[in-house]
Swiss-Prot record:
One of its GO terms (biological process) is negative regulation of cell growth. Keywords: Acetylation, Isopeptide bond, Nucleus, Phosphoprotein, RNA-binding, Ubl conjugation. Residues 147-162, 224-233 have a biased composition (Basic and acidic residues). The keyword Nucleus applies. This is CDKN2A-interacting protein.
Amino acid sequence: MAQEVSEYLSQNPRVAAWVETLRCEGETDKHWRHRREFLLRNAGDLVPATEETADAESGARSRQLQQLVSFSMAWANHVFLGCRYPQKVMDKILSMAEGIKVTDAPIHTTRDELVAKVKKRGISSSNEGVEEPSKKRSIEGKNNSSVERDHGKKSAKTDRSAQQENSSGSKGSSTKSESSGTSARSNSGVSHQNSSTSEGDRSVCSQSSSNSSQVTSAGSGKASEPEAPDKHGSASFVSSLLKSSLNSHVTKSTDSRQHSGSPRKNALEGSSVSVSQSSSEIEVPLLGSSGSSEVELPLLSCKSSSETASSGLTTKASSEANISSSVSKNSSSSGTSLLMPKSSSTNTSLLTSQVAASLLASKSSSQSSGSVASKSTSLGSMSQLASKSSSQSSTSQLPSKSTSQSSESSVKFTCRKLTNEDIKQKQPFFNRLYKTVAWKLVAVGGFSPNVNHGELLNAAIEALKATLDVFFVPLKELADLPQNKSSQESIVCELRCKSVYLGTGCGKSKENAKAVASREALKLFLKKKVVVKICKRKYRGNEIEDLVLLDEESRPVNLPPALKHPQELL
């Protein structure tokens, strides 16, 4: 058929010239050969008979010609490109192209053909039979999750109620045991005090030591108990017991004043009051009562004990009884001073002042009274020295802690020696950076002063997903800088990447300094190869090791000083 068309055009050159005017620009010979046949088959009366008629075409004729050209192009697109058009257009162009044989047209499979093939094979499409099972599964999953949540809530509630019952039971048992323990302790203390009145001086000393040991054990035992409300309850219970014991001691002291019979009884009563004083002074702070009770209760007990002591001294008694009572008082006060450094100084001052007053009023022997005063003052001075030493030790511990903290904060990094392993880790990155910088320089026309060196270097490093580290330091802070730098160059800039030194620059501003440093760094990439080496640099007057980027031929001589310690940046 193609031969027939070519023969026809050779016989009618006028028609051939007219058809050539309908060819599109850039249309291939194969497409044009088949589309030309389509035009000639359906042209009919549109082919001009003479040149005059071709020039004087009417409007209807031109519209028909444009429609024919459009149909021919649609048919060519459908045959060679696989384009699809509305059904009316497809029917029209296929009917117009009957009889045209296209042997070398490509094969295009449409969507309908693919769906038909899939259905023939028995494979269901992705949209069929999927929605209902998925809905059912989602509903079943929701129901199962809701049931599991209900079971979890019920089990959590039962666990919480069981824990609360156990905790309440343990709290009740602990409070009961504590109250029984405190009542037993108070009863034992009262029985010991009653028995002490009928015994001698040795029994009094043993009683005071046993009471102090019992109090310390009780204090340690209660300090280990973790519950705060039980502590407050026991403290209030003990404070009420202490008030009742104080009232009983006051009545006993008044009775002793009225019935001042034998010196033996007065001494024993004074020793019993001192024992109660030591027990009250020790129990109050250990059981966790308030600070006011710590101060007020010892003062009251001191007054009662000093009054009994003065009454015992004013009576004409033997010196041995006075000495024994004073020794028992001083021993009890020393025990309290070791456990209570706060109230010891006030107790000793009251004792010394009242003993001095009793010495002026009494007619007893000066040696015994002097021994009492000297013992009390020595004990007071010892307690003060102990408190001072403890305070000094505590204050010495505080600055040592602060200095250790400051030293730990100042040392942020540990210096380690650089090895060849560090070079092996860094070298592959700079080999890739060398190629990237080379391509960037080619893109901007090579290395020249007109190029923004800082932006070019930063872009090359960011292309490899790394960052350019920039550090600025005023020139005044660098003592290792060469002396040929002028005073106007007041800013120093250092460039690093991957903890490797690239270059240093000085300038009037930060931008100028960074530009100079970037230019010096880019000069390294103009050589044949860049190498990471371990070199020595100066940092605050000391030589340190640093990773430096150099070209293969150069040797590190007079490197600029480091602005920051390299180990800090690793």
